[in-house]
């Protein structure tokens, strides 16, 4: 079984990546293959709502000048998908939002392409907005007819500066529990 994780943070190896890595380490210890993709520095265009994906029905977005189609294919090939984001003004990062919007249209246009795959949201927050971000990511999974594993709490870790989430014992334990329940 393979799990692909996307760090939607504008910072590589920051708090969001630390939380995702905690989940992945549990999955790897159970023998699962994992891959972490960092979206930092990528120019990912948002969906232009052209709906061409509904006429081509080829598992691809018509926009070809970024890596979104590569990422959609990685999600197709994996049994599990983790989408992680920091909170920016009470919502997910623009990179992750663009990926979700474009992948979401492709998923729906192609008969629920991710149906029955496991999807988990991971959120890094400083103070507020963690739950709305967590919910928004989970809505993508639900609309895509994916399975969302339970954890001990919401999959949110708190920290301000890089590395601070390691001090959020409850948040880190939640990620470990997510890894245990998400392995299927």
Predicted features, each with a name:
Residues 1, 24, 29-30, 70, ...:
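Glycine-rich phosphate/pyrophosphate-binding loop and the adjoining helix
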Residues 2-32:
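N-terminal beta1-alpha1 ligand-phosphate binding loop
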Residues 8-17, 44-54, 79:
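Cysteine-centered iron-sulfur cluster-binding motifs in ferredoxin-type domains/subunits
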Residues 32-42:
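A short beta-strand-loop structural module common to alpha/beta enzyme folds
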Residues 33-35, 60, 147:
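Conserved beta-strand segments of alpha/beta enzyme cores
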Residues 42-75:
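Cysteine-cluster motifs in flexible loop/terminal segments that predominantly coordinate metals
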Residues 62-153:
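Helix-loop-strand module that forms the ligand-binding subsite of alpha/beta enzymes
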